Amino acid sequence: MPKRNDIKKIMIIGSGPIIIGQAAEFDYAGTQACLALKEEGYEVVLVNSNPATIMTDREIADTVYIEPITLEFVSKILRKERPDALLPTLGGQTGLNMAMELSKIGILEELNVELLGTKLSAIDQAEDRELFKELCERIGEPLCASDIATTVDEAVEIADKIGYPIIVRPAFTMGGTGGGICDTEEELREIVANGLKLSPVTQCLIEESIAGYKEIEYEVMRDSADNAIVVCNMENFDPVGVHTGDSIVFAPSQTLSDNEYQMLRDASLNIIRALKIEGGCNVQLALDPHSYEYRVIEVNPRVSRSSALASKATGYPIAKMSAKIAIGMTLDEIINPVTNKTYAMFEPALDYVVAKIARFPFDKFENGDRHLGTQMKATGEVMAIGRNIEESLLKAVRSLEIGVFHNDLQEAQDADDEILYEKMVKTQDDRLFYVSEAIRRGIPIEEIADLTKIDIFFLDKLLHIVEIEDQLKVNIFEPELLKTAKKNGFSDRQIAKLWNVSPEEVRRRRQENRTIPVYKMVDTCAAEFESSTPYFYSTYEWENESKRSSKEKIIVLGSGPIRIGQGVEFDYATVHCVKALQALGKEAIVINSNPETVSTDFSISDKLYFEPLTFEDVMNIIDLEQPEGVIVQFGGQTAINLAEPLSKAGVKILGTQVEDLDRAEDRDLFEKALQDLEIPQPPGATATNEEEAVANANKIGYPVLIRPSFVLGGRAMEIINNEKDLRDYMNRAVKASPEHPVLVDSYLQGRECEVDAICDGTEVLLPGIMEHIERAGVHSGDSMAVYPPQTFSQEIIDTIVDYTKRLAIGLNCIGMMNIQFVIFEEQVYVIEVNPRASRTVPFLSKVTNIPMAQLATQMILGKNLKDLGYTEGLAETPDMVHVKAPVFSFTKLAKVDSLLGPEMKSTGEAMGSDVTLEKALYKSFEAAKLHMADYGSVLFTVADEDKEETLALAKDFAEIGYSLVATQGTAAFFKENGLYVREVEKLAGGEDEEGTLVEDIRHGRVQAVVNTMGNTRASLTTATDGFRIRQEAISRGIPLFTSLDTVAAILKVMQSRSFTTKNI
């Protein structure tokens, strides 16, 4: 049926800040949906609290609210906007849960707002374990034996009935939060206790474990006329038991017989029809490899991470189609935008293999628990396309940017057999490398299949890779074998290693005998119909489908997989760069490897190459396209790291030149530049070994800030207070980059701020200065940032503007740069300069209304600020106050310490804007899910050096009616100063937690925790009390503060919202 004309205004709820389990795929889906609805003539109102996304740009919807996704604010917006309808299935679990809450309180009914797409009853049926079980029993679809537990004892009883191993799944949590596999009653008790706490309805599903079954996913679509199709089916390399977001995934499925494929396809369509889903839906199934037995694992009645992957894998835009189905259109009347001929009813067919590998944050969190289970831990993912499994897998491996270019890992090579077996059996993020190593050592693949439950078909492909390696070692420079290796995804670097020559030599030989890649089109129909999508992947075959146009071309390098330190903000800048290039009449070509993002939507750029961001893969595209130049400023450190090798190969780098990038990144050159420009920086020195570092630190004076050069996201950076800790650091952490020296700086504990600037070579524009709430020492990405600054004198602001201009001109910056300053004793020092777009670009672009990445792109292409109507200097400051707050994913990462420091730990950000600082802070805390109760108890456990400062905060808490709880030392200090405080027992390093503060936290007797213990290295073992207290607070969902500046900020909010009661 045609689209509905009885509704005019539609509201969409976004997914909020990026956390593990809910990442950039919802920016992509939401952006697509908003544009699809606008295209059909509807007025779109968007609510989302995440400033880092394209989705929250003004032009994506008619009205955009960057406000917290809470009942309080969404209700306000509903009353103000009065939409006819609400579309909740595009904002991940956040959007769904919000729609449920709005429906429950009756506001949708009161305002006569209709829910579009899948009905709430269907969402309930899919999400509520008990209802879903009833539905599956009714339609004859098999589920795992299971029961619901609302207490730990009930869970034990159920488990005894079903038999171990048991899987625990808390109801209504995202990304498997709080769940896990239990082999014993002890494990069960622990996991269920935590799961019940995290489940909003205090329920856990206790079910039989089918670990070892194959995990298969079907991405399906259905419309209101009951047309239903399979868009894509996918198979996990890892058997059931690893969260699909953490698994290696292949599309289409590889090991299913036709009967198995049809059986599971029928089951998926049966379920989506029974649920009456309207739009996209993801069905996960488990198949017994030894029979036709299968189980339905779960259904996601919404657009998901898998649907983003399926969209990019097939070219079929699921979110866009879902939005059109929601307004009443049917699959047989929506044209497929890829072919522009076939209808959306036509199931995509693939003539290639897609591999997805997850990207994990364990390079940042060395102490994190790397074991993979039913709780998701990956921050992002990469996807690669090839003509066979070997090619797509190896391309995906080198897309990960973890320093490997093949499925071999030094640690795996160094492991003895015992460790190797252990790593194969215990699923970790790096298991692929250990399995590959086992095959290299001649362990039969049958034995590996038995141990790991990985299908022997996949292991045979890994064996094939090893066989090619063995042939390469003995047949050096053999042209036919070189072709075979390239067809199977081998990189030049890997072949060079096996031949013992340089990668340049392999590239030269390849070009001599014309072993060069061709580019194939992703067209949804396996080349059955003409297709016009400019979406390509490389492979070593005959016919090249990517035709070079006569237009002036520019290549933009994307930022690869999302990880801590390099998030969706860089994708945002990439997309804006593309828009600016198109506006200037250039052909914009994007190279990227991330399936979750907007930049890899083929409708964004003029041409999209889905390829790894390595020198070889990028260079092959440059050879074909012959662009005017390459832009590296917007792809984070990934793109910046490619600037030098590309430039050496004769490629023109547009914008700031390589030697100037070096002057900002190389310590000695940077110091010289600052001296020439007469700009102060904290005293510091470089050291290449331990003794040099110690001598430097003694000269500068402790505390020192120490880090390797050339890093993003504060990798391996620490604040060090004495020589013992310094020696420990030099022995433990400097493996981060052996050929680069270590930087030792004086640590100035002042106020920090940062500036993004745009320069055309002669003039410099500063869109704004952002003041950090947390003092220097907390990574800028983990600090709350306030714009405009609230505490700086005019003199300080003038100095910052002056230094920024000097640096931009002095470093010959063309385009964007980011500078971080610290203000110590009213003197401004420069901490660091990044000659590229930074993670604050989206936030600052939105609050100043200056399209920074687009402007910078125009500068890179030779335009100047004056011509574009901008005056140099600091842009005018708006009346509102805006706060950017970091958002963390600690609940998903066991054994990772949440104490903030110079190493970045946040996965996303939220924003709050209002007329006063207090109101903006309140919104940003709410948006970041840091909700403080109006009254209750606050627990203080602080280091000795923080006690004085904590006293004032404690007094403020008491003043607004909070009770104070503290451990012995802190309590005594509070009492001496006239405060009433309840004393609790410390942990005293023992296991017995009875009567201690941990018990208080566990039983909800504490509403907030202020904890600064463990800042010094001496106590950084994970067993420290401070760490255990922080873990407990996080697992209980209790607001935790490890920086006193954040506490002061939230107190400001609470004071502004409470009335004081004073006697006269």
UniProtKB/Swiss-Prot annotation:
Protein name listed in UniProt: Carbamoyl phosphate synthase large chain
GO biological process entries: 'de novo' UMP biosynthetic process; glutamine metabolic process; L-arginine biosynthetic process
Residues engaged in binding Mn(2+) 3: 820, 832
Region (Carboxyphosphate synthetic domain): 1-401
Keyword Nucleus carried by entry: no
Cofactor stoichiometry and binding remark: Binds 4 Mg(2+) or Mn(2+) ions per subunit.
Keyword RNA-binding in record: no
Domain of life: Bacteria
Region Allosteric domain, annotated ranges: 930-1064
Region (Oligomerization domain): 402-546
Gene behind the chain: carB
Similarity annotation: Belongs to the CarB family.
Region (Carbamoyl phosphate synthetic domain): 547-929
Positions bound to ATP 1: 129, 169, 175-176, 208, 210, 215, 241-243, 284, 298
GO MF annotation list: ATP binding; carbamoyl-phosphate synthase (ammonia) activity; carbamoyl-phosphate synthase (glutamine-hydrolyzing) activity; metal ion binding
Gene Ontology cellular component terms for the protein in this record: cytoplasm
Record: residues binding Mn(2+) 1: 284, 298
The record's note on its domains: The large subunit is composed of 2 ATP-grasp domains that are involved in binding the 2 ATP molecules needed for carbamoyl phosphate synthesis. The N-terminal ATP-grasp domain (referred to as the carboxyphosphate synthetic component) catalyzes the ATP-dependent phosphorylation of hydrogencarbonate to carboxyphosphate and the subsequent nucleophilic attack by ammonia to form a carbamate intermediate.
